[in-house]
């Protein structure tokens, strides 16, 4: 998960090379923040799994399809780790109507950060984004504002239990 401080220079070069080598990173401006992954005190037996400089030179051409998927995942996770944080503004509005209290929540993305890389990586590999929810954006509101005949709808949803552990997820949870 972390690298040591003596690896910062080579990792910065590696990240620059990966941005050029990965097709889904074309046109993406990445300001790598290596301080997020560089911590000598958290490296115990081995530093984080990183692609090699040799891979940046050769690319995906010599890899089998399953190896390409794995390498793409490793590269994407490294780029997500050094990318800007995902920032959003969350708004909760509380309304009272006819003696009942209603709540509306909205979220506006300020900086997509690492989520942009994850989204592009998933799209390139053909995966669906499991966490993708439509962003609920609230209109501009002011305290004490009144509404005439607002449109309303009731939505009913069911919760889902957590997914069952597989052998891999059980080991990683332990």
Label the model's feature ranges.
Residues 1-174:
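Core catalytic DNA strand-manipulation module of type IA topoisomerases
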């Amino acid at each position: 998960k972390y690298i040591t401080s003596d690896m910062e220079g080579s990792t910065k070069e590696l990240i620059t090379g990966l941005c050029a080598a990965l097709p889904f990173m074309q046109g993406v401006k990445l300001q790598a923040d290596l301080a997020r992954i560089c911590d000598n005190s958290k490296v115990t037996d081995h530093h984080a799994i990183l692609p090699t400089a040799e891979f940046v030179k050769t690319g995906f051409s010599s890899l089998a399809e399953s190896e390409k998927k794995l390498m793409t995942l490793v590269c994407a996770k490294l780029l997500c780790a050094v990318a800007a944080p995902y920032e959003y503004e969350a708004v909760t509005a509380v309304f009272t109507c006819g003696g009942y209290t209603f709540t509306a929540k909205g979220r506006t993305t300020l900086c997509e950060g690492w989520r942009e890389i994850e989204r592009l990586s998933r799209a390139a590999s053909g995966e669906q984004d499991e966490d993708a929810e439509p962003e609920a954006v609230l209109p501009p509101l002011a305290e004490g504002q009144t509404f005439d005949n607002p449109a309303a709808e009731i939505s009913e949803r069911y919760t889902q239990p957590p997914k069952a552990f597989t052998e891999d997820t059980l080991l990683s949870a332990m």
